[in-house]
Amino acid sequence: MSDAELIEKFLKGDISAFNSLIGRWEKRLYNFILRYLGNRDEAKDLCQETFIRAYRNLKFLRDPQKFSTWMHQIALNTCRDHLKKCQRRNTFSLNGFHNPEETAANPEIEMEKTTVSDPDMAAQNRDARELLNKALQSIPEEQRVVIIMKEYQGLKFTEIAGALDISVNTAKSRMYYGLSALKKVFDQWDIDREKIIYEM
């Protein structure tokens, strides 16, 4: 059953249909929020808050076919509201790096990372994630968001544009400049980008 069909059932009074939407979207939104905030506990809380907001406002969604864009927009606004409330800078955990012209990474990313048996390899992975986290914090938030949505959520530029209320060209521009900025950071730090990706 499609999201649109579940939404129709929910709006007719079938609460279980919304539970089905949660089951379908919880993992994906959790990973989006986790990469935006970099904190697992906060990600869990804000994922729940996102669904609460969606539950209250689903009746106002004009086009059920745009449910994906709508949910990401709610999740992003929930994160931003949280950061304003906390009055602190957000951190990011992004464990990959791709050219914007390449195919987007699989959006279904595991909530927990694969266990690494080799202690040395595990330490290298932690160091790589830390470096990527710091690099992401050095670029503008608007660019980070587009990178997360495109590379890790698998959204199309049209969907990203809708969620952020910007043009498609602006979304592509932010993606390009964000990736370019990250490359410059790695060059400045004399970091082998390919090695970091391999170790993730």
Range-by-range predicted roles:
Residues 31, 45-52, 66-77:
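Structural recognition of an alpha-helix C-terminal capping motif at a helix-to-coil junction
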Residues 11-20, 30-49, 61, 163, ...:
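Short, charged helix-capping/linker segments at alpha-helix termini
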Residues 59-63, 76-94:
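Arg/Lys-rich amphipathic alpha helix in sigma70-family domain 2
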Residues 4, 133-170:
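Helix-turn-helix DNA-binding module
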Residues 1-28, 35, 120, 137, ...:
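N-terminal module of bacterial RNA polymerase sigma factors
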Residues 9, 90-98, 131, 138, ...:
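C-terminal edge and immediately downstream basic/flexible tail or linker adjoining helix-turn-helix-like DNA-binding
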